[in-house]
Amino acid sequence: MELSGRLQAVASLVTAGHRIADIGTDHAYIPIFLVQEGRSDSAIAMDVNEGPLKKAEEHVKESGMEGRIEMRLSDGLEKLEPGEADTAVIAGMGGPLMLRILKAYPKTVGSLRELVLQPQSETAKVRAFLLEEGFLFLREELVKEDGKYYPMMKVVPPHDGSLGSPEKDGENRKEPVRQEIRPENQDAEDSREPGCGKPETPDVWDETEVRYGKLLLEMRHPVLREYLLREEAIRLQILDGLLGQSGERITGRKRELEEELEYIRKGLKHYAV
């Protein structure tokens, strides 16, 4: 099976040999691809809607993988028991929905060896949540497809039972986000690739890195540079259109744009020779 560039990038983040749970599977393209390619022995394809799940089941049967890919009607991780999968893939959904799923099933999330996440919106909020909860970032990727930019990440959840603990509820991050990174034996080879974290070193993410991805900035990802330059041009154009205008609303909008430009330019400094 051939995947789109976005789905190919998502699939490439999954560790070979892992049992897969694809949450919001839609057409089941990722589970089919991973099993067909020998990257995974088995997979569970899950979706909250019967229509997409039925279509996914048809694709699985057409691929001849029905004995190795199980279909489940499930709201997020609801029907996945702890220990049933090594990797959860959650791709192609908005950031707020992704966060709701991660927060709703902390025991299941904490039982996973890794998660591969590809939020369609509010990526910075997803990164901030993961860092605050103690997830370890192993890899980040950014793909441009049909004029849109798709960030994705491979993370390891904390395995100390701290996910969803009451003392973390309502935390409001004001200081730089700190991530204590520990070695993960199963990803030792992964950690030497571009876009990977450094599991042996304590890490700190500032606001710019949370917005755009610390690992992407560290590797000077070319697609991220293109994205930042585009975002800079858009905001400069808007500011130019506000020239000569006044009023409280206009002043507030200008201030907002200038703050965004400051972060964009901090990101672009990583590409300076």
What are these regions (language model features)?
Residues 104-157:
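C-terminal substrate-binding/active-site "lid" region of AdoMet-derived donor-dependent transferases
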Residues 42-47:
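Conserved SAM-binding motif I beta-strand of class I
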Residues 27-40:
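Conserved SAM-binding loop of SAM-dependent methyltransferases across substrates and taxa
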Residues 158-169, 174, 187-273:
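An accessory alpha-helical subdomain
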Residues 17-26:
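Conserved class I S-adenosyl-L-methionine
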Residues 84-92:
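Short SAM/SAH-binding signature in class I
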Residues 1-18, 32, 50-83:
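S-adenosyl-L-methionine
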